[in-house]
Amino acid sequence: MPKQNRQPTREKLLDITFDEVYIHGYTATSVDTILKTAGIPKGSMYHHFKGKKELVLAMVEERLFPKMELFFDFEPKEGKSVTDVLQGTFAAMAKNKPLITYGCPLYRLMVELSPIDVTFDKLLSTRVTKMQDNLALLLQKGIESGEFDETLNVKDFASYILESTWGVLSLSPSLSSSKHFLLHSKFILETLSNYNN
């Protein structure tokens, strides 16, 4: 029975932590703010997490990473070309208001914490590598299907897609828009079309 009571508290803490850290950053987010927003006493948090760092690490694993798979969905789709998959993912990202307004949550956290915390650096870097590898595999399928020429360096182009996308998502909210993001994605697809067979 106690386990049932703790589970909703833990889930609520993770959800609110994701929102707070995404919008305000790790440093500006206080445990007190998270607890106040959640309506949870501090003692309840310590049943689940030793402190802020452990809470945010759990949030990264259980909330941020699954969201990244949705935001950057570069999985091959039956009956669709690689270009169609990329186009569909970019279109979905352009419709995601928080992503356009606040940028990529993984990238934001990485920029803030990787230089100062080894634990976060390893965790976040591992995810970035996985994303690049998945994207490279998708591009490789494009080569194997004859969509792209073999001269396409899939690893380099996967890095280019992620890094340039993070760059455009890092603009200040006043400069960001779905239209601007779609223009950026169009440039990526035009560059990729240079390798079309």
Can you say where each PLM-predicted feature lies in the sequence?
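Amphipathic alpha-helical packing segments from all-alpha helical-bundle domains
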Residues: 84, 118-144, 156-159
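Amphipathic alpha-helical segments used for helix-helix packing
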Residues: 98-119
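Short, basic, alpha-helical segments at the C-terminal edge of helix-turn-helix-like DNA-binding modules
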Residues: 61-68
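N-terminal intrinsically disordered/low-complexity leader segments
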Residues: 1-8
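Hydrophobic alpha-helical connector segments
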Residues: 58, 72-102, 154-161
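Helix-turn-helix
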Residues: 12, 16, 20-54, 58
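Short alpha-helical elements of helix-turn-helix
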Residues: 11, 15, 104-107
